[in-house]
Amino acid sequence: IGILGGSFDPAHNGHLAISKEAVKRFKLEKIIWAITKKNPFKIKSSLSLQSRIKGCKKIIKKNKFIEVKFYENKIKSNKTINLINYFNKNKKNEIFFLMGADNLVNFHKWHKWKQISEKCNILVFDRYGYKKKSLNSKTYKTLKSEKFKFVNFNKVNISSSQLRKI
């Protein structure tokens, strides 16, 4: 199972592209877009949770291998480690956490980031302008590189924050 967590504010074709690539390259059965009510590293979402969920469903359209889910009420947390622990209760699934190289740069600021890297595979999708920063990041230097699988990927050069500025 692949998990792409985020605020999806808004969801865009980059999210879809890395989901498709993860399924193709790593033979994943499905990808879960685990949407958060509030990203702890952002001030405020510009769209409501319901609007973001609706936007995600619109982007994925007929891609049945992607599910849009909101787990925070179920797990009583917006922390990635708690989501990973929730999925690890069912030991038959191998967990792959998907992130862009921009997230690896600040991954060491995430709650229990070392535990996250121990409990799942982390697929880091290259993003224009971030490869060097991510390879020089505290996270990458602190943890063994085998904790991360870098995916060379240059199909989409867009971010939700760029879209909000438009």
Regions found by a protein language model. Name each.
Residues I1-I166:
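Nucleotidyltransferase catalytic core that binds NTPs
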